[in-house]
């Protein structure tokens, strides 16, 4: 069975369910590649022969984001900031003191906007719901930012990838594969630089946390 036949054998409903589930679990606070899954599904929707509807993909992602964030909010509000201390001991790679400190700093700086912007920032995507709940952000304000951010992120990402996929053939005919490779490399480079910048900020906050802990112990 070739790749095209394999893709055509996947029911569209299964694609929507996977998108909603992965995005929802990531929004709940469990690190999963929600954005990668969304982009992949949007790429599938740009191929008419696969019968995957881009509106279904975007809608599933929005529902997953809103429901997952709301559950994460409830958990954070129930257990408070000590929840992140326990998670940090078990999963230091994702919930270490530096990660939590950076996310909390962004929340303190941006307020409810951090929930909206968290849809577009990998670090905040898993922290937005639980941290908003732990910081006792009023739920109506959280929900408004959550729904708005989910629609903009999921709808915008799906539309961008869908229309890019539809226009890809014409674009390649005009600009060649070399231009596409250059564009992909530029995008990957930008993503790496952004990740490195975030990692440096986290490392600095980790070091600051260690210094404070050492001072307290002394």
From Swiss-Prot:
Compartment(s) of residence: Cell membrane
Keyword Iron-sulfur part of the UniProt annotation: no
GO cellular component terms listed in the entry, alphabetical order: plasma membrane
The keyword Cell cycle belongs to this UniProt entry's keyword annotation: no
Transmembrane segment boundaries: 10-30, 55-75, 147-167, 175-195
Family annotation (InterPro entries): DedA-like, VTT_dom
Membrane topology: Multi-pass membrane protein
Domain of life: Bacteria
Cross-referenced Pfam families: VTT_dom (PF09335)
Record's keyword terms, sorted: Cell membrane, Membrane, Transmembrane, Transmembrane helix
Family designation: Belongs to the DedA family.
Name of the protein described by the UniProt record: Uncharacterized membrane protein Mb2670
Organism name: Mycobacterium bovis (strain ATCC BAA-935 / AF2122/97)
């Amino acid at each position: 069975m070739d790749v095209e036949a394999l893709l055509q054998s996947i029911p569209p409903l299964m694609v929507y369910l996977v998108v909603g589930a992965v995005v929802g679990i990531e929004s709940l606070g469990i690190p999963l590649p929600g954005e990668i899954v969304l982009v992949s599904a949007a790429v599938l929707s740009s191929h008419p022969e696969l019968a995957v509807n881009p509106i279904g993909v975007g809608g599933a992602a929005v529902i997953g984001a809103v429901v997952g964030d709301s559950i994460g909010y409830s958990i954070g509000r129930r257990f408070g900031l000590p929840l992140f201390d326990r998670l940090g001991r078990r999963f230091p790679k994702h919930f270490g003191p530096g990660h939590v400190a950076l996310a909390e700093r962004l929340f303190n700086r941006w307020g409810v906007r951090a929930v909206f912007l968290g849809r577009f920032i990998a670090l905040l995507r898993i922290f937005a719901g639980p941290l908003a709940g732990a910081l006792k952000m009023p739920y109506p304000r959280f929900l408004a930012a959550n729904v708005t951010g989910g629609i903009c992120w999921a709808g915008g990402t799906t539309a961008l990838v869908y229309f890019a996929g539809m226009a890809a053939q014409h674009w390649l005919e005009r600009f060649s594969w070399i231009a596409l490779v250059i564009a992909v490399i530029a995008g990957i480079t930008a993503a790496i630089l952004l990740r490195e910048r975030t990692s440096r900020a986290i490392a600095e906050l980790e070091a600051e946390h260690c210094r404070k802990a050492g001072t307290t112990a002394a």
